[in-house]
């Protein structure tokens, strides 16, 4: 996607080409690979080292290094924009996963006859009005859905690489036994389930369930099926740090 804000300033400082970084959805960029099915699946025209995932990774690494040098406690919120539409994994990540090898959800051709009324109504709206936003891959276009899933996996793969670098840096600085690590997300994605894509007003597991991994030094590993919410994270982490929880 088009680069802006602090990310843009950082990318320019790395030698990025402004004409490639700032283009509306990169639709006019020459030479970038793109899907013939949906305009929001394409390879950005700039080098992968200038991508937002690299920006967030490197800023997080620098922040942790600076805190370590000051011997100061730190809270680092490492928030990657991806995976998110437009589906634009850069460089090698665009071809990292083959669409023809993607497993498609069994419910992708759901006619939504048992779904809430607002979803049944939505399905009948003309594609040019709404469906292209929330369900471009639904209602029979398996080729597009496979491309979308492959591109999403590419974005996730790049994030996984960045998270690995951050964890390795924490380890190399000798901070792993004094640092609580949380991995989670703000929402999921339908990824073609029930013929829907992206997120929105669909209260299915695909959008509601997110990964939640918490590592607290000195605590044994375990799993739970108990209902939890990201709203619980603040009080939980404050308690783990011996800080009085806030009201509200």
Q: Where does each model-flagged region fall?
A:
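Active-site-proximal cap/lid insertion segments
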Residues: 4-58, 63-72, 77-178, 182-230, ...
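Catalytic core of tubulin tyrosine ligase-like
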Residues: 233
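His/Cys-centered metal/cofactor-coordination and adjacent catalytic loops
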Residues: 1
């Amino acid at each position: 996607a088009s680069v802006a804000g602090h990310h843009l300033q950082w990318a320019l400082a790395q030698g990025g080409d402004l004409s490639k970084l700032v283009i509306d959805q990169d639709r006019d960029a020459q030479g970038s690979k793109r899907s013939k099915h949906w305009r929001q699946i394409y390879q950005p025209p700039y080098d992968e080292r200038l991508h937002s995932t690299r920006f967030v990774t490197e800023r997080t690494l620098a922040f942790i290094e600076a805190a370590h040098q000051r011997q100061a406690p730190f809270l680092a919120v490492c928030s990657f924009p991806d995976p998110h539409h437009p589906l634009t994994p850069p460089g090698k990540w665009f071809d990292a996963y083959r669409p023809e090898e993607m497993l498609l959800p069994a419910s992708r051709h759901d006619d939504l006859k048992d779904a809430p009324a607002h979803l049944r109504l939505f399905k009948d709206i003309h594609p040019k009005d709404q469906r292209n936003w929330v369900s471009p891959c639904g209602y029979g276009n398996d080729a597009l859905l496979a491309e979308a899933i492959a591109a999403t996996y590419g974005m996730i793969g790049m994030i996984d690489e960045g998270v690995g670098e951050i964890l390795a840096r924490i380890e190399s600085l000798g901070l792993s036994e004094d640092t609580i690590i949380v991995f989670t997300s703000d929402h999921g994605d339908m990824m073609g389930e029930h013929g829907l894509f992206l997120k929105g007003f669909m209260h299915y597991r695909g959008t509601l369930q997110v990964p939640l991994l918490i590592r607290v030094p000195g605590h044994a590993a375990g799993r739970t099926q108990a209902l939890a919410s990201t709203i619980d994270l603040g009080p939980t982490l404050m308690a783990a740090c011996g800080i009085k929880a806030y009201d509200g």
